[in-house]
């Protein structure tokens, strides 16, 4: 069956979302047109407004409608002197959900990947260098993903922190709560053993 040009365009546009293939895009498009046109209009308006009005914080690079985000403007967070470095704005949401961090953030918007042509300036490390040079950051917590690229990025940033004499630590990663050792991969178990904590 030949579909209309506008319908094809809608389905193709929906495929830009992660995990959405041709069938999922078709299902979404048909649902909006058959059962929820009002929701579709609201979605279109919200997307249009978000795309035009949401930018990056001038301090930490997370998403915000203002020049500087609320976290960076918070005096208590400024006073803590702590900075948590993450790969994406979604990681900020995850860290905030723990309730264990009360400092500021710096979002890389990715990680170092020389094979893909992604170098230090592509993930804002020149801006991070400038931030560290200001002298108001007393400790850096590296919360990049536990991948080869994430580890390489953390190592690079740790060296940058050393140049500025700012203490840097890496978040622990290892055996998950409720996990069984026999099901944990060797690399994760190695990190758990190396990052063990004394009980007494």
Curated annotation (Swiss-Prot):
InterPro entries: DNA_Rcmb_RecR, Rcmb_RecR, Rcmb_RecR_Znf, TOPRIM_dom, TOPRIM_RecR. Residues 81-176 form the Toprim domain. One of its GO terms (molecular function) is DNA binding. The keyword Mitochondrion does not apply. It holds the Pfam family RecR_ZnF. SUPFAM superfamilies: Recombination protein RecR (SSF111304). GO terms for biological process: DNA recombination; DNA repair. A zinc finger (C4-type) spans 57-72. Keywords: DNA damage, DNA recombination, DNA repair, Metal-binding, Zinc, Zinc-finger. Belongs to the RecR family. May play a role in DNA repair. It seems to be involved in an RecBC-independent recombinational process of DNA repair. It may act with RecF and RecO. This is Recombination protein RecR.
């Amino acid at each position: 069956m030949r579909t209309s040009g506008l319908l094809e365009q809608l389905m193709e546009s929906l495929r830009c979302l992660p995990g959405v293939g041709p069938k999922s895009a078709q299902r979404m498009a048909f649902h909006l047109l058959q059962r929820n046109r009002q929701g579709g209009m609201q979605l279109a308006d919200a997307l249009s407004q978000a795309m035009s009005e949401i930018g990056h914080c001038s301090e930490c690079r997370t998403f915000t409608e203002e020049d500087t985000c609320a976290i960076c403007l918070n005096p208590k967070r400024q006073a803590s002197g702590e900075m948590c470095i993450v790969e994406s704005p979604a990681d900020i949401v995850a860290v905030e959900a723990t309730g264990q961090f009360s400092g500021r953030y710096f979002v890389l918007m990715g990680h170092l990947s020389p094979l893909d042509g992604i170098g230090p300036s592509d993930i804002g490390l020149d801006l991070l260098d400038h931030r560290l040079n200001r002298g108001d950051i007393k400790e850096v917590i590296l919360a990049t993903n536990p991948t080869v690229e994430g580890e390489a990025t953390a190592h690079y940033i740790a060296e940058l922190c050393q140049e500025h004499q700012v203490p840097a630590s890496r978040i622990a990663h290892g055996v998950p709560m409720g996990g069984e050792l026999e099901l944990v991969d060797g690399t994760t178990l190695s990190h758990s053993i190396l990052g063990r904590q004394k009980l007494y």
